[in-house]
């Protein structure tokens, strides 16, 4: 991996994998992503997207009817891609406070809830699930005020704690923060949750295609310093 730039993909390994995997089911079994926080198999509906932002857009659009006229309550420490996803889904939002130790300020969250609030969006930061006292309170607040819960596991993709994780109505995350890949995201919908059926959008636009191309060529140019690099540079 190249920190601060594009990932490097090993073409030979990719081709070798393609030759050894005979069908899609075998590929899913060998290389499919497991939702580690889903200890009790409550999320049978999972969609893999091109990035975490797209995953969030799908989730917000899935509950658009339920959220009509409502706002999403966000932590005041988050990636701007979440705001971008909300704007893409034409959703309104407010904020609650995050403590210095990256736990949720429950008092701030509770005070921020109004009759216009329709969803709590929260994040497990840096692989550490939010404390049980916090997640228990989130569940109570959601039940009391009839709120949806969206759980962002981008930073805790491999964490597992059935009492503190895996209880949101939606789970979203960016997989590329952990895997050596150019991009990737996941959205999971809790079993039994009704929502609007959505067609899958074309996941890769021109910029993502260029990223994939650059990542594929990087190793070659790193190991062949005399090769003509103009094609690579033109697409960087």
Give the ranges of each region predicted by the language model.
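Hydrophobic anchor at the start of a short beta-strand
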Residues: 46, 93, 149
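Short, hydrophobic beta-strand segments that form beta-sheet elements in well-ordered domains
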Residues: 26-30, 72-74, 146-154
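Conserved PLP-anchoring active-site segment centered on the Schiff-base-forming lysine
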Residues: 61-115
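Short loop/helix-cap segments at secondary-structure boundaries that form the rim of catalytic
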Residues: 39-42, 85-88, 159-167, 221-230, ...
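Active-site phosphate-binding strand-loop segment of PLP-dependent enzymes
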Residues: 102-197, 206-207
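Short, polar loop motifs at secondary-structure junctions
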Residues: 32-37, 77-80, 153-161
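Conserved PLP-binding active-site segment in aminotransferase class I/II-type PLP enzymes
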Residues: 1-68
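Conserved core segment of the aminotransferase class I/II
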Residues: 180-236
């Amino acid at each position: 991996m190249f920190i601060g730039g594009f990932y490097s993909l090993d073409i030979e390994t990719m081709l070798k994998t393609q030759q050894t995997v005979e069908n899609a089911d075998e590929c899913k079994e060998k290389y499919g992503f497991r939702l580690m926080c889903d200890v009790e198999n409550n999320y049978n509906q999972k969609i893999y997207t091109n990035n975490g932002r797209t995953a969030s857009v799908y989730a917000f659009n899935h509950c658009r009817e339920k959220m009509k006229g409502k706002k999403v309550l966000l932590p005041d420490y988050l990636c701007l891609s979440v705001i971008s996803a909300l704007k893409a889904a034409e959703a309104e939002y407010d904020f609650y406070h995050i403590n210095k130790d990256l736990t949720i300020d429950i008092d701030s969250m509770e005070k921020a809830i109004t009759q216009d609030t329709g969803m709590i969006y929260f994040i497990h930061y840096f692989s550490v699930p939010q404390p049980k006292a916090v997640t228990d309170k989130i569940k109570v607040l959601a039940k009391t005020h009839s709120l949806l819960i969206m759980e962002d596991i981008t930073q805790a993709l491999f964490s597992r704690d059935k009492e503190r994780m895996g209880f949101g109505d939606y789970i979203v995350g960016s997989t590329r923060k952990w895997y050596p890949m150019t991009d990737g995201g996941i959205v999971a919908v809790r079993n039994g949750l009704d929502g609007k059926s959505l067609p899958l959008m074309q996941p890769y636009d021109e910029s993502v295609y260029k990223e994939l191309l650059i990542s594929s060529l990087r190793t070659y140019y790193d190991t062949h310093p005399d090769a003509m690099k103009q094609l690579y540079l033109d697409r960087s």
